């Protein structure tokens, strides 16, 4: 007990000291709370400050002091929050209960309109806690608007200046402003965010100072219950009582934003009515005496005091406008003396009351008469609107306060106000111009050492554009001092090239470049040193940017400055640098503004022009312009399309005939053959073949036979074609076909024909589009090959046929023959690709009575030469073994698809082939026995003549003379004394190129073995006027001489070796000069019959020993001529110069004579060897024959060269076939209605072209067939394949 009492006694001094601190702290409280703080006494503090320990022990100790027990009991239920108390409460006792919050008053809705202060049917604002009510007519809304569910907020919550949310509102009207607009608004704050506007505070001050109403210049009657002033007074008194507003609060109300800047806000507490002492309360709450450096603003309410208004002479009218002076003169009987604004308002209200101009339905609205319309310019104005409009007519005259004495101290007016009064008339200030002078008081840079903000505004002041720097180059000496410290904008390289990232860097210096560089129209060597983050770099001026800087770039610069990578910029630095760029920045801004205004002026002028009736009338009378397109003219389209299809025609013979895929494509003309028979009188021909009875060796150069495509063919609709469904479409014009072809609607090998023609006379669409028609140049197919044959009569029993080969140069060919007379056949071959004229080769042939053709041995001639004794000229030279891929048409009309040596009864045959490009050439022609004035020859005569013919064709050689190339045939007959020598002249240094490949197979009678004498070979030179065409093409297509050095003896030795091994024999040997076809160029891919062949000055000839060998071979039985494989090579001879072909006729067998004439059209096989059918050779070595007894399933799809062995000692050399670009292509389009005569399933194509390649499996090199779809590599067995495992061919 004693201890507790001692503790209580010891606590008394502490409480006393605490009370002293509380008393000192009360002095710091705002004077507005002085009355509340005075209620706290010193005697009450000890009871409120009892320690907690004492309180805890008070329950067990009986206390005599009832007051202490009462305090403890009251403090016991106090709940304390857990945790450390806030710092503000650290020094205060924890057990003191905070004062309870003031009870919230329920929102009361007002029952009068907030505008007219009258009752009636009112609507409430939907904003929360807004009690204001309005008449719908006062807010200019219909009652139907408020029946909707839409929410409506009154104008009290919207700033009247910027229409944003308001922050400060007036007590007695809908005036409200936001935080930004309050700086310039006529508004004073009374309590919190509530205050009074300049219009409402004046009548309120009149209401509050009614006792001093005698001092007012104008008296207003607020007691008239029928006036608006009475309603306003009632509303204010009710509001004042509800809010407990005092007169002191009204007098201390001000606008703190209109105080002098950069000074501590001071509140002047001054009550003019109670004469209280004014106190200036600082921020810290201590009293401070006002010094001479503390200016004050003039009181806003000084205008109501008559002492502040300067009285002027009655004649002075500078205080108001003309309209207001007229109104005042009317109200005061001509007195226009100076009045205050409040006096003018009183006069205006009296005038409205006297004239009864208020709207009876809306008391807040005034109906203006003629006098008020002049003053306000409206027929109807509101009350507050009227008072505001009146302010613009009153020029307020205030008495300047140069000095004011307060409590014995001198105070000065605001310096800015003194300066303003010194500039303008100190007696008159027009408030309408106040807003224009607000920029004069703009705050300048006070602290020049402060750090500048890194924003777009500041950086633009020191931003050096590229064009600025270009203008500074005129004065090179001042560049350094003007650019140092400026900011540049450069592009930085980033990972994403799509985004242009720029960086702001600062210039730290300049330097000179080693070499000058071009900068627009100027040349300079100035380089800029920049601080790029943390390193110095030197850049040229052309790397700078002229574009405006962005906020992101300023943000990155600000971040780099904060990281210490760049120097911090101060206000002085920016001002100093901006001064150097000020002139350039101003010039640029002015130019941009002037340009903008010029554009606006032009647009205004244009707008004025468009609004004028003259322009409208002119536009109505203007004739619209229609654009023209020359390409829509049909004649223009024809000429344009014709120019695309035509190309320059060269008179020279091209060295190579290329297919659709150029190199490496085998064109297999396994088409649909149509068998037709033509009688001699009805043979139709677009290329008439005339034979001169008197001079068969002269061929007239008739250029009129060659017809070019004309304009009529382009425009006329005469062309037909067949679609994939088999229907014939047409007629169409060439223009339409060309467009459809370019659009890809047609396949590459579509054939078309004219309306007056049939489908058999069709031509390729590609050739027709190129202007190559079949009028004079196309030999479409053997089935549609009409020829006119005119045989000449024979003077003796021996008949020889001279065939004149007409070349492209149309030069006459001289031939010679020992026979007394010979029949002549002249043919023009039409080539749609090259427009060549097939040369007719003069060879020894026999025609008997025009009905049967004497058998002739088979001779291979150049590709452009066709030899058909007495009947047909075929421009292709090729050996045609009797296989299933060649359809043989015999003269008697029998269709023979397989021809063997036994069927031919050992009859010799002559095959002359030419290179082709056109598809669908495997068509058969049946030639009947033509009428002839000569009697038919007997079989015995044919047998005798065959021997002579074989000898005449045995030495068919190529001779290159000074004037050209000559085919010469020298014959030495053992059975006939007559010797026939015929020459075929081929000029131009190159064999002509032909389009079709027709093979003529003639059965020859059996004769004795032939003895060939090489010495009898003669060379016939052509005339000097022959044209040389592409002479450089011959060496390019010839292999090296050392690669073609196999002789006939080597081949025959190989034949015997292969016979002993039981291998099948071949009638010919393989001509292989290329060991690697991969190195072949386009020149080596010459047309088939003369591929890898060139001319030589020497004559390729056979020895007698070779002839004897052939005699010995022919003594045996006749061998079966089986189905020929892909490649049928021919023998060659090795020479020191360019390589020549050797055509060695075999000895005929002694069997019956064949009277058959077979004409076979074969397809072109690019890259294959020229073949020569040697006739019915008996037991020739199988390696020479180069065919297999087993038919190849792909014999028709490829014709590649097979390998041949020169001797048993020589290593075999295999010619590699040409590569294929892909598998065979099945065409969707039908082949113009031609039916295929082949029954092979793998060759039953819809289109004649095939891309697949086959291989010769009968050459003796390979024993097994390749897998389906694979091809044999020719170089694998010989070990020459360099591709190895990467080779795309089959390695068996």
From Swiss-Prot:
Zinc finger (C3H1-type): 1267-1292
Protein known as: Zinc finger CCCH domain-containing protein 44
Residue ranges with Low complexity bias: 661-675, 813-829, 1188-1206, 1231-1244
CDD domains: GYF, PHD5_NSD, SWIB-MDM2_like
Pfam family of the protein (one): SWIB
Domain Plus3 per the UniProt entry, residue ranges: 453-586
GO molecular function: DNA binding; zinc ion binding
Listed Basic and acidic residues bias regions: 689-698
Species in which this protein is naturally found: Arabidopsis thaliana (Mouse-ear cress)
Regions of compositional bias (Polar residues) in chain numbering: 1-10, 404-414, 699-708, 882-899, 906-915
Taxonomic lineage of the native organism: Eukaryota, Viridiplantae, Streptophyta, Embryophyta, Tracheophyta
Domain SWIB/MDM2 as annotated: residue spans: 313-396
Region (Disordered): 1-24, 72-107, 256-313, 401-426, 624-731, 777-832, 876-915, 1170-1245
GTP-binding in keyword set: no
PHD-type zinc finger locations on the chain: 110-176
Keywords associated with the record: DNA-binding, Metal-binding, Zinc, Zinc-finger
Leader sequence segment: none
Membrane-spanning segments: none
Ranges for domain GYF: 716-770
